[in-house]
UniProtKB/Swiss-Prot annotation:
Pfam families in alphabetical order: Exonuc_VII_L (PF02601), tRNA_anti_2 (PF13742)
Name of the protein this chain belongs to: Exodeoxyribonuclease 7 large subunit
Catalytic reaction list: Exonucleolytic cleavage in either 5'- to 3'- or 3'- to 5'-direction to yield nucleoside 5'-phosphates
Record bears the keyword Nuclease: yes
Length: 400
């Protein structure tokens, strides 16, 4: 019996009918770990279900997805009720899920959270250790696969923003055996050479297994100990790895990392203009302060000019002279007044003035005034002083 030659479409349709009519394949209960999880804008959910040895693609349409009472996560272990279907155009099969139940967190996620907790307690995620990225780097180091979307995206963004920046690529394995060691070697290379200002650790998106290289303890400590600031750009925005937590900065995507580390030419121009304005203001302030100092010195010198000092001293001497003249005259006038007063008193007390009123003074030969008759005896010679002269008289008769 000769078998009919079938087209590819006929083969796929035949397999599709066999699968869809198989009772077991229409009523499957399958357990495994979720990976490659995607929530489509249509409301459908796409993911893979895997175990240690195999993987199968799955889809849950919106009408079933709305009945889930929990949110699916990468690495989550689940049990699904599904039917196996064949996509005849591609000749592939997948599980169409009707219901999903939790079966526990996946082993990789358990390991991830355990390591994250340990490293957090050891303090290497602390904000106090995070360094600011250089504002205007000259050379940027990239550690990623030599080929792939990640390196292309990073380089394209940097060159678009600023063609003057140097880019140095250290090609490293980012997935599979010894990948973590390869990235560690790249970090050490840049630190030993001191050839770049910032390092980007990059990798495109993928499942938790594909990103697992960046959940390595040794790599985490190498990033922590790097003397050069690091940016982790691993996977997509929803993907998180240990490298993200320990790096100085996390970029949601490799392209975003290129934006973070590369200042645009306009930013550099604006910075230069700002610095120019700052310098102008600083110079103006310096000039004004110096002018004030010069003015103060000028005033000081003017005040200490010998000519001005002499003129000041002359004025002081003239003032003192006037004061002395005034005080001297006042002193002399006072003395004259006192002399006049004394003279008046003397004139009043002068015996000669008494003689002018008809009185006379009798004195003995020793010019002693004789006040009483008892002081005389017969034949004594006395002098009688009168207003206009004196006479000498011999005492002949004494009447008592």
């Amino acid at each position: 019996m000769k078998l009919k030659t079938l087209s590819v479409g006929e083969v796929n349709n035949y397999v599709k009918k066999l699968v869809e009519n198989d009772f077991i394949l229409k009523n499957l209960n399958v357990k495994g770990e979720i990976s490659n999880l995607k929530f489509h804008s249509s409301g459908h959910i796409y993911f893979s279900l895997k175990d240690e040895n195999s993987k199968v693609n799955c889809i849950m349409f919106k009408n079933n997805a709305v009945n889930l009472d929990f949110r699916l996560e990468e690495g989550m272990k689940v049990e699904i009720k599904a039917r196996l279907g064949v996509y005849h155009k591609e000749g592939t099969y997948q599980l169409y899920c009707e219901n999903i139940k939790k079966a526990g967190i996946g082993e990789l996620f358990e390991e991830f959270h355990k390591l994250k907790k340990e490293l957090s307690e050891e303090g290497i995620f602390d904000e106090k250790y995070k360094r600011a990225l250089p504002k205007f780097p000259k050379r940027i180091g990239i550690i990623t696969a030599r080929t792939g979307a990640a390196v292309r995206d990073i380089i394209n963004v940097i060159q678009r923003r600023n063609k003057s920046l140097d880019i140095i690529l250290y090609p490293a394995k980012v997935q599979g055996e010894n990948a973590a060691d390869s990235i560690i070697e790249g970090i050490r290379y840049f630190n030993n050479e001191k050839s770049v200002d910032v390092i980007i650790l990059g990798r495109g998106g993928g499942s938790i297994e594909e990103l697992w290289t960046f959940n390595n303890r040794d790599l985490a400590y190498e990033i922590f100990n790097s003397r050069i600031p690091t940016v982790s750009a691993v996977g997509h925005e929803v993907d998180f790895t240990i490298s993200d937590f320990v790096s100085d900065m996390r970029a949601p995507t490799p392209s975003a990392a290129g934006e973070l580390v590369s200042p645009s030419l306009q930013e550099m121009i604006n910075d230069l203009l700002n610095k120019k304005e700052f310098l102008h203001r600083a110079i103006d302030r310096k000039f004004l302060n110096a002018k004030k100092d010069v003015d103060l010195l000028h005033k000081g010198l003017k005040g200490n000019n010998p000519k001005h000092i002499i003129e000041k001293r002359i004025k002081e001497v003239n003032s003192l002279e006037e004061k002395l003249n005034f005080l001297g005259k006042r002193k002399i006038d006072k003395a004259k007044d006192e002399l006049i007063a004394l003279n008046s008193i003397l004139q009043t007390l002068n015996p000669l003035n008494t003689l002018g009123r008809g009185y006379s003074v009798i004195m003995d030969k020793k010019d002693k005034v004789i006040n009483e008759v008892s002081e005389l005896k017969k034949n004594d010679m006395v002098k009688v002083i009168m207003k206009d002269g004196s006479v000498n008289i011999d005492i002949k008769i004494i009447n008592e």
